Amino acid sequence: MAEFFAAPFWTDFLWPLIVMVAQSVLLLVVLLIAIAYILLADRKIWAAVQIRRGPNVVGPWGLLQSFADLLKFVLKEPIIPSGSNKGVFLLAPLVTCVLALAAWAVIPVNLNWVISDINVGILYIFAISSLSIYGIIMAGWSSNSKYPFLAALRSAAQMVSYEVSIGFVFITVLLCAGSLNLSAIVEAQHVRGLGSLIGLPWLTFLNWYWLPLLPMFVVFYVSALAETNRPPFDLVEAESELVAGFMVEYGSTPYLLFMLGEYVAITTMCAMGAILFMGGWLPPIDLPPFNWVPGVIWFSLKLFFMFFLFAMAKAIVPRYRYDQLMRLGWKVFLPLSLAMVVIVAGVLQFADIAPK
């Protein structure tokens, strides 16, 4: 037995595989529980803006409402439309949900708290968010109905339009941090930035990129809303107008998987906002008692702050028309983000403050 545990097969392959699977399962459980309460927070925030209580029946203060909704969806019978492509129809929500969950493999919630700390973390996130379009197109095409298909095409056009702007946002952060590794980007906001330049390195929040890259932070925030089909850019679903968009033929567990994938993608974008612009797990002030708080708590607070901005946009901003949405993406955000890339690169080069 001792020889087996000392063998290269165990030490180099099997044991790291077991650890990675255990980490993945733990992350999945924590993430799903967090999604349940983020969904509840979304409904509570929306209710508070409209001066009502929101979910308050299931459990104390409605805390178990999301689990009751889960049970309701699971117990319903899935109905597959006649004439639809059954395999693709059932595969589409699974693709959407799995891709959304896969993005969390590279997101660090604290120092060294990440499943796979790859050196191209931003590129991986960008690729995963691009692949999510396939699940939507598969759902629209396989439903054998013109309405889901048209909604899927609208969604694909919308997501592609705003991925360009998000790509330029990533490039800007890459220029400032000098790395595609998400952990390295967070550490760069600890050692370099405005606070360090003015001689106050302990004011960590001045080192974060939200201040020098404020226009790009706004572009990222609005583009993330459009990328995840959130109000005021929920033209694909538009609850009060189009019923359910490309999900109109779905019900039961497949519909639940689509909703789960949507909220996981929203949480991923919130996490990326916290990492790229708010210092990830870093405290706002690198002095006691702030640096006594575990980094995962700071990361969670920043993530929830980003989600609060998402929820407030849903509650107070009216829905855009489709032509307004496309005009904003191609005629405003694309030139602005491209200009910011050039400006940031020029400032870093001529001020000789580019990362070495």
UniProtKB/Swiss-Prot annotation:
Reaction(s) the record says it catalyses: a quinone + NADH + 5 H(+)(in) = a quinol + NAD(+) + 4 H(+)(out)
Chain ranges passing through the membrane: 18-38, 87-107, 120-140, 166-186, 202-222, 265-285, 292-312, 328-348
UniProt EC number: 7.1.1.-
Leader sequence residues: none
Cross-referenced PANTHER family: NADH DEHYDROGENASE SUBUNIT 1, NADH-UBIQUINONE OXIDOREDUCTASE CHAIN 1
Function comment: NDH-1 shuttles electrons from NADH, via FMN and iron-sulfur (Fe-S) centers, to quinones in the respiratory chain. The immediate electron acceptor for the enzyme in this species is believed to be ubiquinone. Couples the redox reaction to proton translocation (for every two electrons transferred, four hydrogen ions are translocated across the cytoplasmic membrane), and thus conserves the redox energy in a proton gradient. This subunit may bind ubiquinone.
Family the entry assigns: Belongs to the complex I subunit 1 family.
Protein name: NADH-quinone oxidoreductase subunit H
Native organism: Nitrobacter hamburgensis (strain DSM 10229 / NCIMB 13809 / X14)
Gene: nuoH
